[in-house]
Amino acid sequence: MTNITGIDGTDERDMTKAETECRKQIIPIINFLREYVPGYEKCYCISSASLIGIRETRHFKGEYTLTKDDILSARVFDDWVVKGAHFNFDVHNITGAGLDKTGMQKQFSQTKGYTIPYRCLVPVKTEGLLLCGRNISGTHIAHSNFRAMPICFALGEAAGTAAAIAVKSGISVRDVDAAKIQEKLI
């Protein structure tokens, strides 16, 4: 319910500013609930999160970058590690309040789930690391879709499975065969 824009999620001063501002926004929300929502006349805030949730900061560059076209076309990658991913685009304006002006919220013609390739989890320049969750390699628009919790859970399972295969086989995560991951996930 609270919101702030124009914050650099990688800068501790900006994070402190955002946390302070969003905590200030709680009081008017409580007052609104007390006045306009039956049953909330005596509501109060017990606590708030210790850290503000940042929707998006930097994007890692993986061996493949997932795009909105991949999602809209329900593209099936040979090296998929997530399949059946399905969520609406939830693009927020990165330069100010409100929704993005691209119209992506209205453009959702995806009729079946899409896949996410293993290459999105493998960073281009870093060895021994896998990306998972909302930090996989993808465009700003694609991120608004794959950052949903069910998809992030599946990405975490895929990354953990790949890491286990790499350790057991004595190879780099970069060299794990996606077919081996698929066997374990199915």
Language-model segments: residues:
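Flavin (FAD/FMN)-binding glycine-rich loop and adjacent Rossmann-like elements that form
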Residues: 1-186
